[in-house]
Amino acid sequence: MTISVALAMLQRDGRWLLQLRDDIDSIIYPGHWGLFGGHVEPGESPADAVQRELMEEISWAPSTPLQPWFSDDSGTRPAHVFRGALTAPLEQLCLKEGQDLKLASLEELCSETIWSDHCQEQRPIAPGLSIVMRRLLAEMDDA
């Protein structure tokens, strides 16, 4: 059975919420910036998985369900990407997974690395985030 992931592309004030993954060799893309989310458990829908993962990782639940945006199976695992508004200020989020979080600008998202205040250094963007950014930029060009 293929394990898929559900990811959240959350926007607040023209910036997008990112997670800096832990520096643990056993996880995919350690030390890279990516989106909050995670594995879809057996019998769980991707929509339920993204809600659960947000609660587990940042102790936050959206007031309205996130909207399915797109699915992609070109990476290491099939990904279901959801989008929505981050209605809580960054300071109200409680980071429980990962080593940093950040609201990144479009310019930062289009670069190869993003600064981590916690680590005090530039960290790379996960390849999966590049797929999401290409989709976002294509939609912005179409608008």
Question: What do these predicted ranges mean?
Answer:
Residues 55-90:
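Active-site segment of metal-dependent pyrophosphate-handling enzymes
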Residues 1-18, 36:
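Conserved N-terminal beta-strand and adjoining loop/helix that marks the start
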Residues 4, 78-82, 102:
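Short beta-strand micro-motifs in enzyme catalytic cores
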Residues 15-56:
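Conserved Nudix-box catalytic region and its N-terminal flanking loop in Nudix hydrolases
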